[in-house]
C-alpha cells in the first residue's frame, strides 16, 4: 500500500480506456457470481478468484497450495495467486464492451460537457446516443453539414442520393469519432477571436465552451475519453454477497447492475458474430448504453432500474452521495474500536479531571493492556491464560486493572457534538454499577443532564494520542469557552444555592460581634455552637499575612460573616479577601470601610456596615466572575482546584442549610381578584369602543393584550415586594440556582396570556395560578403554547445543525499558518449600536486583539497602548475610560496569510487567554462557536408589534442564515450609490411611491421607494455610498458593488452580532470575521488583460494576484477583477479542494467538474486529509512539528503545557546556531 503521509497533493482525471485495462487483473466475461452448490466463485464471473484474488488467506482455490510459505505462487491447476484475501478489496477487473458507450456524468450533467465540446445541444446529443437519429461525421462533397442530424428516413434518402460519399453514424461510436476530430488549439483560438465581438447569450456560451476546451487542452485529458470501450469492475469485497440464515443470499445492488451490463454485452457480441440485422444490433447497443448508465448513475436518465419491491437500485454514484455515502459514512467518520457507551450519572466526589468508568466496561476497554500486564507480572503464564482469567473475572485482575488505567486518560463524548468541548479527556476511576460517572461541573460544556442521557467513551491508544489527550484535552484545562472567553464551567443548582446560603448575613444571630484571631479559632467557635455561618464577626487581618490589605490596615480588624470567612478559604493565600461580590473587590484589596477605626466599638461598626453585608450574598453570576478572575491571575491548575473546592463547599452547605420548598412557601396575594376584575372592566370598555367603530380590530386586539400584560406585571411587582429574602423559593431564584420571578408569578399570581398555534396570543388570559389550579378551558389553552414550544425546538435543532455543518465546511481550512503576515492594514472598530441601544460595547471588541496603530488619549495626546500590542482587559479598560471611541486593530479580514490567518491578526485564543499558537484550527473553532448557540436563537421572524409602516425585520436563526448565505434579505433597504446630499423627497400619489433624490458631486441619483417603506433620511442630510435611505436590511451583494469588500465584511459582522446579542448570546467578533472572510475569498474577472484567464471566471483572490504578478513581471497588461460575495454553501463548493467539496454536497457535479479539469487537491484543509487518512495539518500535524528530530541530551523544560514554549526553544536554538 502507498503511505499517505508521503504525498503532497492528489490529482483526479479522466481514465483512458487503456488506463482502465491497466488497472484490471482480468476480464469479467460471465454474469455468474457464485456456484449455488459449492458456494465458490464461478470462473470468469463477478467474483472470480483468478481475477480478484483468493477468498481464503494464503490458499489457492483448489487447495493445492496452502500456507504463507507459497506466497506469490500462481497455482497451475486453478490459476489463483496465493496471497492475502485482503487483495479482494483492492484488485479490479474490467468488462470489454462490444460497442463503445458514453459516460452519463459527462453527457447528462449541467452543463452537458460533451454538448459544450461538440457545440451540440444536449437534447440532440441524446437522440444520437440512444439511436434515435444519425449524425453526419464527414459530409464529404455532398451538401450536408457536419454534425447535422438525420432521422432514419432522411438517412435512407441521403444514402440513396449520395451513396458512400458521406459518413453518418449513430450511438456513442459517432460521438467518439466527433470528439476525436475536435482540434482543441484551433477551437480555442476561434473562440477567443469570437469573444472580442460577441455579446449577450452568444458571449456567455462562448465563454463556457472556451472554459471547457481550454481545460481539456491544459489538463492532459482527451475529449474522446468521455466515451468508454471498457468498464472497470470494482473489487468484489466492496460489493459483497453474504449468506443469510436460511441459506438465502443478500447481495449489493452493484452486482445486479454489473450482471445486466455483462448479459447485454454478451448478447451484443453474439448478435455481431451472427451478422444480425442492423435494427436488432442497434436496439441491443442502446440497451447496453442504458445498462452502463444505470451502473454509473441509476435514475439520472429515464426511469431508474428497480430491484425487488420496486426499489431503485443503488448505483456507483449513490455509493458516494449523501449521509450514507462513502464520503460521509466511511471516510469522514468511522466506527472505532476500544469504545463503549452507557447512561451517565453524577458523582460529586470526583475531581474535575476524573470520570467514573464501570468496572466491566473498563475491563473490556483496557483488555489488551491488562493481559500484557498479567503476563508481565507472572500472574498468567501466557496470553491465552490471561484472556481466560479476564473472561472469568478472576480476583487477580482488578488490582492489575487499577494500575493499568493510571495515567491513561479516556475521552468522553456526548452527542450532539456541537463544539470541541463536547469531547474531553478524563482520568478514569473504577466505579461499581453500569453507568459512567460525570463530574457535575463538566455538564455545562456537554450540555448534559442526568435524565437518561448517554455518553460514549473512547480509549486513546498510541503514546502521541495519550500525550495529546493529557496535555490538550484534559477537562481541567477547558475552563473558558472558545466562543467568548468566559468560563464555561459555571457552578449551577445545589452548588450555587449552598454558597449563596453560606454567604448570607443576618443581624442578631448568636455570637454577633465576636472577634477572632484566626479562622481556626472561628471554626472552633462554630463547632461549639457559639456562632452561626450568618453571624457577623470581626477577624484579625494578621491571621492572613499573605493577602493584600488596604494601606494602613495590614494589622487591623475587619467585619465579615463566618460563612464568608469559610468561603474565602477556597481562594489562594495571596489573593484578596472577598466581602462584596463586585468587580472592584475581585481585583482590589477589601474596602477600608469594613475595618474597625482606632478604639471603635465593633457593634457600632456592625450597625454601620451590617446592611452592606446583608445585601451581598454571592450569587451564581458572581461565582462565574470569580472563576474568570482566578483563571486570569493563577491559570489552569489553581482554577481547577478552586472549582473542586467550590463544588464541595456548595454541596456541603446546601445540605447543611436544609433548604426545601413546600406549598406554604408560595405567598398568598390578597387583592388578586380585584386586579383581575379591574382589567376585565377595561377590556369591556375597549370592546365597546370597537363596536361603535371608534377603533380598528388590530387596535382593539393590541389594547386587550396590553391591558392583561399590565395586570400581570402589577401582580408580579406585588409578589416581588411581599416575598421575604429568607423564603426558600426566593433564595433559589435570587441566587440563580433555579427559577426566576416569572415562575413565581405563575405559582402565586396568574399565568397570564398564552400563545396561539400561529405565534400570536389568546385574548383570554389564564387568571388562575398553579397553586389554585387551572380550569379545564385554561388548561386547554395552555397546551397550544406548550406544543408549539416542543415543535419549534425540534425544528430549530435540525436547522441549527445544518447551519453548523455548512459553517464548518466553509471554514475548515482556516488554520493559524504563521507568526505575522506583516500587513499594515487593519479595521477601525467602535461600539455596535442599534438606534440608541448598545449591541456590543467597544471593550468587548478590543480584548484579545492586536493594535494596528498606537492608541492615543484624545484629551492629552499621550500614547495609551503602542502598536502591535495584544490588548488585555486592563488595557481595554484604560482605552475606554480615556474616552476613545474608535480604535484601529489588526483583523482577520485584512490578514495577508494565504490559506489561513497569522497569529497577530487573530490575537488571543479565547479558550486559553494566551496568544494563539501556530497550528490552531481557528476556522473549525469559529464555525462551532457560531453554530453551537444556534439552538438558543429563535426561529421566528419578528414583526414590529403591529406598528404600521415599519417593515418586518428578520431576527434569530433565519437572519443568521440569510447573512451567511448572502441571500436577498426580507425587508430590504434601499441604499445610496453616491456620496452626496439628499436633495428632495417627493411623494408620488399616482403610483403610491416616494422619490428620494441624492445629489452627488458628479452625478445625481433618484430612488423610487414604496409608501409603506420608512424613510431613514430627511432633506439636507449628507449620505455616503452604501448608507441606508429606507429602514430595513441591506443586501450585501448590492453593498459590495457600491462600496468595497471591507465595508461589506464589517456590515455582515455587525449584523451577525446583532442577531446573536439580541438573544443574549455573546460571540467574539473574530469567529464571525473568519467566516465572513471565507465568503469574500473570490473575485470575478472583468477584463483578462494579457493573462490567460477567461472573462467572467470566478477565482481565488490569491491565484488572481499570482497570475497578475507573472504578467506584470513580464511587462504585460494585468487583469482586472471585482470581489464577489458567495454564500457559505456556494463558498464551500467553490473551495480549491475537490475532496472537501465532493464530501459536502452535490458530489457527482463536483467530481465531474474536477475530473475534466484534472484538478489537483493541495491537501491544505482538514477534511481532505481526514478523507485520505493523512494526519491533519493543524496542531502537531503541521509540517513544522512533523519534521522534528528528538535530541539525546535534552533537559526537561519547566512547562510542558504549551506548544508555544517548545516553539520558542526551537527558535532560540536556531538563532544560537
Curated annotation (Swiss-Prot):
Q: Which residues bind Zn(2+) 1?
A: 60, 62, 75, 78
| Annotated positions binding Mg(2+) | 449, 451, 453
Per UniProt, which keywords does this protein have?
A: DNA-directed RNA polymerase, Magnesium, Metal-binding, Nucleotidyltransferase, Transcription, Transferase, Zinc
Q: What InterPro entries would the database entry show?
A: DNA-dir_RpoC_beta_prime, DNA-dir_RpoC_beta_prime_bact, RNA_pol_asu, RNA_pol_N, RNA_pol_Rpb1_1, RNA_pol_Rpb1_3, RNA_pol_Rpb1_3_sf, RNA_pol_Rpb1_4
Q: Which GO terms describe its cellular component?
A: DNA-directed RNA polymerase complex
Tell me which domain of life the UniProt entry assigns to the organism this sequence originates from.
Bacteria
**Catalysed conversion reaction:** RNA(n) + a ribonucleoside 5'-triphosphate = RNA(n+1) + diphosphate
Q: Which Pfam families match?
A: RNA_pol_Rpb1_1 (PF04997), RNA_pol_Rpb1_2 (PF00623), RNA_pol_Rpb1_3 (PF04983), RNA_pol_Rpb1_4 (PF05000), RNA_pol_Rpb1_5 (PF04998)
What's the Enzyme Commission number for this chain? 2.7.7.6
Cofactor(s) recorded for this entry are: Mg(2+); Zn(2+)
Respond yes or no to whether keyword Magnesium is given for this record. yes
Q: How is the cofactor bound?
A: Binds 1 Mg(2+) ion per subunit.
User: Which one GO biological process term can you cite for this protein?
Assistant: DNA-templated transcription
Gene3D superfamilies (UniProt xref): 1.10.132.30, 1.10.150.390, 1.10.1790.20, 1.10.40.90, 2.40.40.20, 2.40.50.100, RNA polymerase II, clamp domain, RNA polymerase Rpb1, domain 3
Which class of enzymes does this protein belong to?
A: transferase
Keyword Membrane set for record: no
Gene Ontology MF annotations: DNA binding; DNA-directed RNA polymerase activity; magnesium ion binding; zinc ion binding
List positions binding Zn(2+) 2. 821, 895, 902, 905
Check the record and name the PANTHER family matching this protein: DNA-DIRECTED RNA POLYMERASE, DNA-DIRECTED RNA POLYMERASE SUBUNIT BETA
Please name the NCBIfam families in this protein's record: rpoC_TIGR
Subunit text:
The RNAP catalytic core consists of 2 alpha, 1 beta, 1 beta' and 1 omega subunit. When a sigma factor is associated with the core the holoenzyme is formed, which can initiate transcription.
Family assignment from sequence similarity: Belongs to the RNA polymerase beta' chain family.
Q: So what does this one do? A: DNA-dependent RNA polymerase catalyzes the transcription of DNA into RNA using the four ribonucleoside triphosphates as substrates.
> What protein name does the entry list?
DNA-directed RNA polymerase subunit beta'
